[in-house]
Amino acid sequence: ILFKMITGKFPSLRLRRNRKNDWSRRLVEENNLSSNDFILPIFLIDGKNKKQPISSMPGVYRYTLDKLCSYVEKAIKNKIPMVALFPYTKTKYKDSFGTEALNENNLVCKAILEIKKRYKNNIGIMCDVALDPYTSHGHDGLIKSNQIVNDETIETLIKQSLLQAEMGCDVLAPSDMMDGRIGK
């Protein structure tokens, strides 16, 4: 009878007993989140000695490269395995082609190099693959004649991905929404 209660079907199998008490729910729960499951987003800003609040996200800040490492150290101390980097690009670096995304001295590339130099492989780095931080029009896709040119955009995204990987990025996270961007 016990075997049927464990492996059988209703009405022999009654799983409500697993949900009856707090201790039993905790015992059989599928997921148990820990800091090992988190990725810490870090928003970057050019300059020195800045921790700039982001008004649309209370309690969240943009950090300059000189402030970045103290924030990364907190992540490592709290056993967060990875950071995700997101740049805030000054208008003077933006153009309609997202050229700054391909600059090996852009903010994200500098941050990757700094984190890898200081922390080696003690923390992973994820980077957003997208052009919107770098385009003057704010779209992920390149625009010609008021249309997104998907295939040309993909070529630029490939170059951006390769650059981030060459700098030491561990995980590429494409968010651009272009058709066919994976697998080319």
What does each model-identified segment do?
Residues 1-4, 70:
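Asparagine-rich low-complexity intrinsically disordered tracts
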Residues 4-5, 133:
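Compositionally biased, intrinsically disordered low-complexity regions used as flexible
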Residues 5-50:
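N-terminal amphipathic alpha-helix/helix-capping segment at the start of soluble metabolic enzymes
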Residues 37-39, 46-184:
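Alpha/beta enzyme core
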